[in-house]
């Protein structure tokens, strides 16, 4: 059996970072949105090999990006193991291989690893499920703070560690430019720097919520915010000039996506987004740039991680 699932990249229209709890995680107030960059995960059963104990994953390969782990530390591999453990029946299973095709910038603050985990959960559910949406979301939250959102997609408010999700009403599509850097940033490193700098927390999203309801791109751009910006700029000062170039070339607003170093720029139209993308590339400050729209997908069954093919 071969199952391919797809999951979208995410960006944060707002990321407010509160104090750290005893477990080291910070209280967050965030607004997630999927954008139509994506990864796919293909799970293939190796029917000639049955596994009675230990991981059923025997191989993991990655194309489209360098530096992604191809071992049990990969979040997709861990997603298989975590969901397999939830089976009621403990009979032997076929071994499986995983292949990840990357279209989301790696270590860029766009939840590429979390998207892979979410797509993998959908694939395993199609293989040996159904487990039910509640179980999938529970396992997703165990795997990482962004995985539940990647499973569900759309535009959502996230609180707690980002895993407590509520749908948000939006109007129309937003046009984005995604500017990727050659080297990623470690999320724990960014949060550590944030704690050192200790900037003011911004936990109020009421103005952004109202702007999203209008569908007015300029209004939405006015309320984009990320509390991790100062930390990301401290670790990667060159991001400041990337943000300046995006605004100079016509974007309404630009912010660091998540923990960075990817930056995203909100534009008035697809045409303007193309202009901003070309200006960023011509300036020679970014590794790659893409245009995208959000929220991704036009149908409800494709708004989050979803199955593409089963054969």
From Swiss-Prot:
SUPFAM superfamilies: GHMP Kinase, C-terminal domain, Ribosomal protein S5 domain 2-like
GO molecular function annotation: 4-(cytidine 5'-diphospho)-2-C-methyl-D-erythritol kinase activity; ATP binding
Keywords: ATP-binding, Isoprene biosynthesis, Kinase, Nucleotide-binding, Transferase
Top-rank lineage group of the source organism: Bacteria
Gene Ontology BP annotations: isopentenyl diphosphate biosynthetic process, methylerythritol 4-phosphate pathway; terpenoid biosynthetic process
Reactions catalysed: 4-CDP-2-C-methyl-D-erythritol + ATP = 4-CDP-2-C-methyl-D-erythritol 2-phosphate + ADP + H(+)
UniProt EC number: 2.7.1.148
Catalytic residues as annotated in Swiss-Prot or TrEMBL: 10, 146
Keyword ATP-binding part of the UniProt annotation: yes
Keyword Nucleotide-binding in annotation: yes
Family, per entry: Belongs to the GHMP kinase family. IspE subfamily.
Alphabetical list of NCBIfam families matching this protein: ispE, PRK03188.1
Name listed for the protein in its UniProt record: 4-diphosphocytidyl-2-C-methyl-D-erythritol kinase
Native organism: Corynebacterium glutamicum (strain ATCC 13032 / DSM 20300 / JCM 1318 / BCRC 11384 / CCUG 27702 / LMG 3730 / NBRC 12168 / NCIMB 10025 / NRRL B-2784 / 534)
Gene: ispE
